[in-house]
Amino acid sequence: MKVDLNCDLGEAFGNYSFGGDNQIIPLITSANIACGFHAGDQHVMNDTIKLAKDNGIGIGAHPGLPDLQGFGRRNMDLSPEEVYDIVVYQLGALNGFCRIHDVKINHVKPHGALYQMGARDKVIAHAIAKAVYDFDPTLIYVGLSNTLLISEAQALGLSTASEVFADRRYEDDGQLVSRKEADALITNTDEAIKQVINMVKFQKVITKNNNTIDIKADTICVHGDGAHAIEFVTQIREQLTKEGISITRLGG
């Protein structure tokens, strides 16, 4: 049994610093690198790719909506054509820096509101997946487990990785509880680790309404920007290892 640990990185831009990329990157196996629309800029993208390469982890594109002020977490009324174009644009930007470092993009994971829109809207999900497929059909597509993100990508023939979240609560339909709700995040480390093991080992998760639903876990999203993020991810790694679960990069 194996699983990937992924984290969103490269979210600083200009004079704005964000996250602890240098501290978290030795603990993960895949990096989702912001491509300049919701966060990141050309210098940060360049530096983050080099950091990921030096640590031997999978490099992923993390395209988001063009909304720096809202960190890409606010929905936008976009046509499928607009969604397609913003995804291709960001993949091209990241790929340019990958080429100068002689590395390849390994996977793609939509960010924030784009991710949530795709999980719920078949047309948007198809537009995102089609952009990825047309750019490079060999890329691994990361999406929320058991949602349209995964099914639309698979329908096009993309390899997919079903994603679960260590520190997020779930609705009964498998969607994530909205960040607008007070109980959306799991702040207790023991509870989060228990949820991770349950999802990876038994393919189950307990929802916010205390119901048990099926879930597929190919990759676990962890975050590097919390007060206890490093300790949290370290404990997750240790517990996965104790359970006999190998931590391996996507496609590895």
From Swiss-Prot:
Record keyword Nucleotide-binding present: yes
InterPro entries associated with the record: Glyco_hydro/deAcase_b/a-brl (IPR011330), LamB/YcsF/PxpA-like (IPR005501)
Gene Ontology terms for molecular function: 5-oxoprolinase (ATP-hydrolyzing) activity; ATP binding
Protein name: 5-oxoprolinase subunit A
Family classification: Belongs to the LamB/PxpA family.
Keywords: ATP-binding, Hydrolase, Nucleotide-binding
Organism: Staphylococcus saprophyticus subsp. saprophyticus (strain ATCC 15305 / DSM 20229 / NCIMB 8711 / NCTC 7292 / S-41)
Keyword Acetylation included in the entry's annotation: no
Gene behind the chain: pxpA
Gene3D superfamilies to which the protein is assigned, alphabetical: Glycoside hydrolase/deacetylase (3.20.20.370)
Superkingdom in the source lineage: Bacteria
Enzyme Commission no: 3.5.2.9
